[in-house]
Amino acid sequence: MASSSSSSSRNWSYHVFPSFSGEDVRNTFLSHFLKELDRKLIISFKDNEIERSQSLDPELKHGIRNSRIAVVVFSKTYASSSWCLNELLEIVKCKKEFGQLVIPIFYNLDPSHVRKQTGDFGKIFEKTCRNKTVDEKIRWKEALTDVANILGYHIVTWDNEASMIEEIANDILGKMNISPSNDFEDLVGIEDHITKMSSLLHLESEEVRMVGIWGPSGIGKTTISRALFSRLSCQFQSSVFIDKVFISKSMEVYSGANLVDYNMKLHLQRAFLAEIFDKKDIKIHVGAMEKMVKHRKALIVIDDLDDQDVLDALAGQTQWFGSGSRIIVVTENKHFLRANRIDHIYKVCLPSNALALEMFCRSAFKKNSPPDDFLELSSEVALRAGNLPLGLNVLGSNLRGINKGYWIDMLPRLQGLDGKIGKTLRVSYDGLNNRKDEAIFRHIACIFNGEKVSDIKLLLANSNLDVNIGLKNLVDRSLICERFNTLEMHSLLQELGKEIVRTESNQPGEREFLVDLKDICDVLEHNTGTKKVLGITLDIDETDELHIHESSFKGMHNLLFLKIYTKKLDQKKKVRWHLPERFDYLPSRLRLLRFDRYPSKCLPSNFHPENLVKLQMQQSKLEKLWDGVHSLAGLRNMDLRGSRNLKEIPDLSMATNLETLKLSSCSSLVELPSSIQYLNKLNDLDMSYCDHLETIPSGVNLKSLDRLNLSGCSRLKSFLDIPTNISWLDIGQTADIPSNLRLQNLDELILCERVQLRTPLMTMLSPTLTRLTFSNNPSFVEVPSSIQNLYQLEHLEIMNCRNLVTLPTGINLDSLISLDLSHCSQLKTFPDISTNISDLNLSYTAIEEVPLSIEKLSLLCYLDMNGCSNLLCVSPNISKLKHLERADFSDCVELTEASWNGSSSEMVKLLPADNFSTVKLNFINCFKLDLTALIQNQTFFMQLILTGEEVPSYFTHRTSGDSISLPHISVCQSFFSFRGCTVIDVDSFSTISVSFDIEVCCRFIDRFGNHFDSTDFPGYFITTKLGGHLVVFDCYFPFNEEFTTFLDGQFNYDHVDIQFRLTNDNSQLKLKGCGILLSEDVPSLDNRPCSPNILPGVCEDSALERRSFRTKMRMMRMRLLKKLLNR
């Protein structure tokens, strides 16, 4: 037998070759096993279901001989295949010749039966040996005995397959001597990055592959690349990590000018080869490098360098390196990757809110989650760091060990940049090396963050900034990103841009942009602005009053962008404007004029709007804009929504490029000017709720119009000619509809109230319609069967049509996913027009039963039957809907039968823990329903909200307060779970719904007085009813490592204190009682090995704890965002 040293010196193509009988394990055990190997970056040979024959395929023989380890999965039918047995012969041969390692797995099979060829395995083996030579049989028997004598894994000795598979994978890592370094194992989210990178690296391939890691500064690219290097380096013959430190050290002993210097290139290559071959004194010459590494399987990481000369010198061509080599290039510049034909690119994205908070907590508390009294503060800090890993880490380390009061004092200062964060991000800005790109960066940071890309390009046109190229460069360098045609810049990068502008001058009026409230107020009040100011952006929600000098803008004659805005148009905050009567000047160079709640009746008389591109003045007090005709060739967008005093629109005959005109809720407007006929490029016209509008000029045909909203124009007497190619139309509550209306390309149509249909509805509609809304029309009595011609219809809303009795039968709208028939009070039959509906609203209809056929709606997620006063029964087949998330039967006062047999709980076994969710059921005011029976029959993945004033006797532990203390309880599993019930009293005379979260806090106390606190958020609830509510839910608390550290290493505790809280600060809500039933007392859980909220077989899986933690964080963040927005 070959020595282990000769084995380890071979250049293996694969780490593992699996030998198995596909009939038994391919789609079960083996698929999970191979997935775990992939997750750990262990390269396995995959046969891709090669057609099997009697002789061993050459490809399989190559796979066996080039694998470091052979894993033999012995199963019941393994010996039925001469193919498997011949594989085994080759494996034994490789074991003897060059020390191939072999790991046997006995899958539902006694090892002795394999070793001695007895039992059912022996019988199958004897059958296979028929018509075979004696020599073949003997060699097979010897191979079976040889491998079965090796210490392996017997599945019956393990509690579950998952644990065994993980142990085998770790065993393989150990045998391969490729156990990953522990340096990065505690990094939050690193495993997810490595898993995603593994598919790009495609390690099983023999090709030489270059892979890029791309993302903005501070997002964790270097951390990910170092973790990969640590994990992978020992799988390669050579490995080297190249960063700026490596380059600077290589240049220290050289006096040349730069990398273009040929000698410098050789010197850099010499340093590189010294790392590759682990030798100090290497002498090279022209072309030596590619020859020296040509047969070397190498891992090369080039981090944070976008210097073309460095890449050319060290990895100029993939042909330089041996088969299987991987070159990873880490950069902020996507263009650099493209230019070097690196097509496999991993984009590093910001972590989720939950992961960001976990990152911060690791830095601040050295734990995964914050102490309860720091939860909200920690969430706010993470929010202000914008989820950027660098910011989270720096802020966490700075706040570690500091008292809560200091945290509170520090929060206002977190809007600025920490020195380390600022320096890191500044490198990205300085790396632009182009003044135009730098200028675009500052424009976005100060003015345009969150604006539409198309608007930004128009506003910066003619600016000599080469905006198209500049935006592409900023995207490539991860300084901005584009989502849904909206441009976004990270909050810390935005703060960097603002800080750069602040350093331009100590005098705010001498700066390029004004972005701070104090500076803006000072400049506008004291008239200190100069020609250097290009833009002003002010959120009026930040101030209560604003003084504007009559000559404030005269010194700023280069002002291009004036943005005085509010994000809270729905809130009527009053700002005291001090605008002098003689205020008569705005710079004529303005391209963007946004002035929400403008306080005057018209714009300054000396303002010339010829350069305007975008005019937005929502909720203004304007009565008119200006007099006369102006050249408005550049104007693309005019938005005057909510300007209720506006009486006239100026002459727009020269606004020939206007694309969007929004006049919604301009309730004093009586007519449109005849000049709109010249708006040949108008695409979007919104005149909704112009309730005094009477006429639209006749003969107007806006051929480019795509969206038209005339909803609520109740006095409209004449209609414009609607183009046939329009795609979106809302004519609800209008006085009339023209009889010649034909809508060939219509995608969405909204009709309601006083609409009089002069022609049958279906003749008006395009078969490509995807959404139809038809509401509040008492004359509508039936839906015609011809609706089936709308084969692309996805959303159908027929609401409050109180004389609608039936829907057509025998049709199936395949595309329909949402159906709303609410308040159709005469509708008695359950709809049967589509089997693909996911959202069904039948509230306040006359339906009497949920039929057996409900099971056909296999994709149903939401069912609303609130207020169905005739509803008598709900079919038990509803429990077969495996996607159902919420069902509301509140105020179904005649409902007597609602059976939930729990048969769908079998489905839950198949769901991943992270995707697992409860079914929320609402039975408030169902007075004839046996609520006690309903609670007792509740399956373990549901929540209930019911009517009630006290906790039912079903719950063995009850109290009229908000907390319960339990004495010592013996626990056999690594979790604590129970069914909880709270009595919530709603005292409100508002018609608005009341929502609330329930928080359950458990304090586990051991016999020494040590305690550990854990919190669960069982759900979010909503109600519109007064009085008492019973809320029933299931809670789950895992006993993780942190828990056992506190409680003497065992699942033992003296008692548990359980407190129920309402997290909402709402005086309308009171918690008046609570109760619990321990999980072992829940009938539906008798045979469950896990908690009510957890899947069988995975009760120790950390994913469950993460799921609970993410739920908690999501709810906390929602409340926090609401609080921040209301400031």
UniProtKB/Swiss-Prot annotation:
Miscellaneous notes: Ecotype cv. Columbia does not respond with a hypersensitive response to hopA1.
Disulfide bond annotation, renumbered to this chain: none
PROSITE patterns: TIR (PS50104)
Keywords linked to the UniProt accession: Acetylation, Hydrolase, Leucine-rich repeat, NAD, Plant defense, Repeat
Protein's recorded name: Disease resistance protein RPS6
Positions of post-translational N-acetylmethionine modification: M1
Repeat positions for LRR: 197-221, 540-563, 587-609, 610-632, 633-656, 658-679, 680-704, 766-790, 791-813, 814-834, 835-857
Pfam families named among the record's database cross-references: LRR_3, NB-ARC, TIR, WHD_ROQ1
SUPFAM superfamilies with a match to the protein in the record: L domain-like (SSF52058), P-loop containing nucleoside triphosphate hydrolases (SSF52540), Toll/Interleukin receptor TIR domain (SSF52200), Winged helix' DNA-binding domain (SSF46785)
InterPro entries assigned: Apaf_helical, Disease_R_plants, Leu-rich_rpt_3, LRR_dom_sf, NB-ARC, P-loop_NTPase, TIR_dom, Toll_tir_struct_dom_sf
Record's subunit section: Interacts with EDS1.
PANTHER family in the record: DISEASE RESISTANCE PROTEIN RPS6, LEUCINE-RICH REPEAT-CONTAINING PROTEIN
GO term, biological process aspect, one: defense response
Keyword Nucleotidyltransferase assigned: no
Gene that produces this protein: RPS6
